[in-house]
Amino acid sequence: MFAKDAQLISNSYYTATAQALPQQPSLQGHIQADVCVIGAGLAGLSAALELAQSGFQVTLLEAKRIAWGASGRNGGQAIVGYACGEEPFEKAMSMDEAKRAFNLTIEGLDLMRERIRQYNIDCDWVDGYMTA
């Protein structure tokens, strides 16, 4: 991680309001797993959950704490599309492939909604949109 990124994390709302966690020992010895997921941000947690639900024995490793990096620095918005916009996708692939890539972001939001319902997560989800 770059020093600039570390400062962003230490000055984030997430860091300022997160409850202190008890120290956990580093992983010692050997463990057995079908899959090891490294990083417990939204992507890593999602991958680990999906794999575990499919019957795999999963080990999830995180250096800091859950959602410590980019997942903890956002303002809580889950928005369709990509930060770079659609143009790079349209240049790199066919229009059908670019549309499929965009549709993956819609499916991602649908999956988040489903998991919120499935696990009864109290997160004050509000559907909306942003324009700038």
Predicted regions and their residues:
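Conserved catalytic-core motifs of eukaryotic protein kinase domains, centered on the activation segment
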Residues: 70-72
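Dinucleotide-binding Rossmann-like beta1-alpha1 core, especially the glycine-rich loop
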Residues: 81-132
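Short, hinge-like loop/turn segments at secondary-structure boundaries
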Residues: 75-80
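Extreme N-terminal leader/targeting segments of oxidoreductases
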Residues: 1-35, 53
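N-terminal Rossmann-like FAD-binding beta1-loop-alpha1 element of flavoenzymes
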Residues: 30-60
